[in-house]
Amino acid sequence: MTMDSFIRFVGASQSRVPNVMLYDDRQIREIKAFCFAADSASVLSFDKTFNLESIYVTPSVYKNTAVNRKCTGDHPVFLGPIFLHGHSDRLNYGMFFSHLSLLLMDCNQQALMLGSDDETALHQCMQAFFPRAALISCTRHLQENVRQQLEERIGLCLELRCSLYNGVWRRRPDVTH
């Protein structure tokens, strides 16, 4: 069986949905160049974005600091390795991050910043396999989680939610971007 060069790993255990890791050599080279640069490192971010039937998709993204957008001057966001998996647990994320840590083991982890939402298993595996990297959380996810807790779990009225929210982020909790 010949595999496409973008499909780098397919594996399954017991009665679990198979895991698939997708990336190419260019993505790994660029992550090494842009996410480990001491002077202008890009954050390598991961987010379990959506569910396709029984499969979750966890893409990674980074900024290509060698390119600037003409209209804004910002660096464009590029897609990094993608992880397809059936469970969002430490076993699955551990396989993914151990694989990535082997690919990046010749890099200085202390220069690396990893970003994610606050999903526990994802965060634990990032910390376990990249122990010297800086872990940062996505503000948008934190804001949404706080809004949801204040509104749905605690049941605070909009006025109190706005007051608390504004004290932390200087904006209203019902504003999504």
Name the predicted role of every residue range.
Residues S101-H177:
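Extended amphipathic alpha-helical interaction segments
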Residues M1, P76-F78, L150, I154:
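DNA- and nucleic-acid-binding/regulatory domain cores of transcription factors and nucleic-acid enzymes
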Residues S15, P76-F78, A128, R170:
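Compositionally biased, intrinsically disordered/low-complexity regions enriched for serine, proline
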Residues M1-L52:
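Electropositive nucleic-acid engagement tracts
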Residues A12, Y23, F46-T49, T65, ...:
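Structured beta-strand/turn binding interfaces of compact recognition modules in eukaryotic regulators
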Residues E30-N108:
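Electropositive, glycine- and tryptophan-enriched low-complexity nucleic-acid-binding patches
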